[in-house]
Amino acid sequence: MANGKYAARKLKQDRQKHRWSDSDYARRARGLGKKSDPLEGAPQGRGIVLEKVGIEAKQPNSAIRKCVRVQLIKNGKQVTAFCPGDGAISFIDEHDEVTIAGIGGAKGRAMGDLSGVNYKVEKVNGVSLIELVRGNAEKPVR
């Protein structure tokens, strides 16, 4: 390895070459995160509810977390989204239009005991799901 007085260019070239061994760098440089992301890099996305599903929590927890299968409008991809709040699933029906966002897990992945669920429902037919759960708003009839 070059260590001399005028070795800066060689040191820089070697560093740039070996950076590609780091999988995080390689994914970032090639934009693979955005390519594989159903929302295509956007912070939120709209979709149509296909069905309600109950997903079992991972060990040591024991629960059935209420989620929905959503087909995104922009590209037709299907994702599972969590419905946060007590009784929130009752405000969501099939064929409703929902707005989803990332659930906030580490490195943009799943959160807590919900494996494979990377998104949460934020709005139902344009009304905030939290407002519906609290009783501050009513769901509009479509």
From Swiss-Prot:
PROSITE patterns: RIBOSOMAL_S12 (PS00055). Residues 1-44 are annotated as: Disordered. Residues 11-27 have a biased composition (Basic and acidic residues). InterPro entries: NA-bd_OB-fold (IPR012340), Ribosomal_uS12 (IPR006032), Ribosomal_uS12_arc (IPR022863), Ribosomal_uS12_euk/arc (IPR005680). Signal peptide: none annotated. One of its GO terms (molecular function) is rRNA binding. Part of the 30S ribosomal subunit. PANTHER family: 30S RIBOSOMAL PROTEIN S12 FAMILY MEMBER. With S4 and S5 plays an important role in translational accuracy. Located at the interface of the 30S and 50S subunits. Belongs to the universal ribosomal protein uS12 family. This is Small ribosomal subunit protein uS12. The gene is rps12.
